[in-house]
Amino acid sequence: MGRTLAEKVWDAHVVRRADGEPDLLYIDLHLVHEVTSPQAFEALRLAGRPLRRPDLTLATEDHNVPTTNTLAPIADPISAAQVEALRKNCAEFGVRLYPMNDPGQGIVHVVGPQLGLSQPGMTIVCGDSHTSTHGAFGALAFGIGTSQVEHVLATQTLPQSRPKTMAVTVDGDLPAGVTAKDLILAIIARIGTGGGAGHVIEYRGAAVRGLSMEGRMTVCNMSIEAGARAGMIAPDDTTFEYLAGRAHAATGPDWDQAVAYWRTLASDDDAVFDREVVIDAASLTPYVTWGTNPGQAAPLGSLIPAPADYADPAARASVERALTYMGLTAGTPLSEVTVDTVFIGSCTNGRLSDLRAAADVLRGRRVADGVRALVVPGSMQVKAEAEAEGLDEVFRAAGAEWRSAGCSMCLGMNPDTLRPGERSASTSNRNFEGRQGPGGRTHLVSPAVAAATAVTGQLTAPAQL
């Protein structure tokens, strides 16, 4: 019987397999940041263990760093301590670090791909949920906890139970104005936040093939929001063109050999998935979340649902709680929901193509009175590339704030937060209660919808401008 893409990559990395035990996987790339690594490094130090493969370990500062006044000391003592610990640990154990203000610094899931470190057929881990981003390259990439971070630092291996496999096939072409972010929000709304639990999702079909690499990263990034262990897309010419010439990509005969192998990394025709879902791309429109989990999403042109629309008592209760927290009334058109803040950035949508999409909408327009718009590039390289194209001038002319690189308002662990009761349209990945600050209300959207929303002050698709 044939094998799926996930099974091929998994099998190629099994160091030890024994009945009744998890497989021991070799890890090709370990990405590290300041939040989940301090205890792991301290455990190595206390045990007197060296770092097994510093050459396969890369660190960057992203979660806690400010995106303004970056030359000043970090004001929050906990954030400052975590950043300082990362710098100390990387220096002691020989890990390459991209610190704040370094031209290579940025969000870990933006930095890895732009360096060409994320490659097809690899196993990639990080102490961060959205490590699934790298699955866009045909890598098996997933988040791990701090104790697992220690295990990888010490051994370059990780015990893991073999996951199930799931295929999400998106047939046809995405309509004009529908983006990768809309696609993944629609998928999560369809299968639910637990729909991928215990599975590696492989995204397939013409619509997925038509996405750029940055669009594919957006889709794979939010696999965890569907409950999946990881998300993957089989590599193809789009993948190879993106990687060619990057700092850590092979060259010459080594490149040719790598591409020849990468072309074998597709699910076999007779491979059997544990679950399959098919979606018609033509049916999709711009999506937005209305509730407090990414599965509570709907087309922007629809109405906010009512608890009575749900037969399951648990679902009804969840909707009631979400509407109360979000301060919304069932039956209200989503397009009438007003916002205070717009955030464009994150490891989901902080890449150059995302900023271009937002700038295309904002060019020649102004951010609405009373609305604050933050544009935060995913890395210092993205920032430099955007400035070379004049995108920063477009944002500033529109009245938006142009920031330095970092996770920023994706999560309330740095100065960029919502105040209680404030509502945002955000290109990030999670809309949980308090995710962007205590009492903050988050609507997940694409960069284009975020930019259009900034102009009108209410949830808006660009086509409505």
From Swiss-Prot:
GO terms for biological process, alphabetical = L-leucine biosynthetic process
Top-level lineage group = Bacteria
Binding note for cofactor? Binds 1 [4Fe-4S] cluster per subunit.
Give its E.C. classification number: 4.2.1.33
| CDD domains tied to this protein | IPMI
Is Amino-acid biosynthesis there in the keyword field?
yes
Please list the reactions this protein catalyses: (2R,3S)-3-isopropylmalate = (2S)-2-isopropylmalate
- Supply the PANTHER family for this chain: 3-ISOPROPYLMALATE DEHYDRATASE, HOMOACONITASE, MITOCHONDRIAL-RELATED
Report the NCBIfam families cross-referenced here. Answer: leuC, PRK05478.1, PRK12466.1
Question: Which HAMAP family does the annotation name?
Answer: LeuC_type1
Role description: Catalyzes the isomerization between 2-isopropylmalate and 3-isopropylmalate, via the formation of 2-isopropylmaleate.
Q: Quaternary form?
A: Heterodimer of LeuC and LeuD.
Specify the protein name.
Answer: 3-isopropylmalate dehydratase large subunit
Organism lineage = Bacteria, Bacillati, Actinomycetota, Actinomycetes, Frankiales
